[in-house]
């Protein structure tokens, strides 16, 4: 049965990489853009508890409202995405959760292929099922690497760039 399925070793895959500081490399259209450390050595890195709850909740609401309650996949969004994409004959609608977006950005490329999507799903399943990285840490990394404007990556860069504020000071005003 599936509860007995265990992976004894991940080899050199580095699936636990997000648990500590790591270098994140940004690529667009297979072209290297820049890299930066995700962790305390980066002055723009912002721990989760120092990010405004308004911003955290806005991201959760817009990207993946059930992030802290699912195991990496939102089946309803995935089904709707597949139906729309098949109907239109192209990748027109995404069904990615925050977990899936994070794995794509940290471990894979942005190419929209079935093979890449399968890799993404497998890595998400491995990390979530085996609790390799906590949900809080995954959300923290996500908020520190997502592109929030041209060459603006993570809330530590975005808050001062757009609002002249620290991430903790973001509000609804």
Stretch-by-stretch model annotation:
Residues 1-173:
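Juxtamembrane regions of bacterial inner-membrane/periplasmic proteins
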């Amino acid at each position: 049965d599936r509860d007995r399925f265990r992976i004894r070793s991940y080899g050199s895959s580095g699936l636990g990489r997000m648990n500590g500081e790591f270098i994140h490399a940004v690529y667009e259209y297979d072209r290297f853009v820049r890299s930066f450390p995700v962790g305390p050595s980066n002055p723009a890195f912002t721990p989760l508890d120092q990010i405004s709850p308004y911003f955290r909740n806005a991201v959760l609401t817009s990207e993946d409202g059930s992030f802290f309650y699912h195991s990496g996949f939102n089946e309803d969004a995935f089904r709707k995405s597949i139906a729309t994409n098949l109907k239109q004959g192209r990748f027109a609608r995404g069904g990615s959760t925050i977990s899936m977006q994070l794995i794509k950005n940290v471990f894979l490329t942005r190419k929209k292929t079935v093979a890449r999507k399968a890799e993404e799903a497998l890595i998400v399943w491995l990390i979530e099922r085996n609790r390799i990285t906590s949900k809080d840490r995954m959300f923290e990394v996500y908020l520190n690497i997502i592109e929030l404007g041209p060459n603006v990556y993570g809330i530590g860069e975005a808050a001062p760039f757009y609002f002249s504020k620290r991430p903790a000071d973001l509000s609804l005003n």
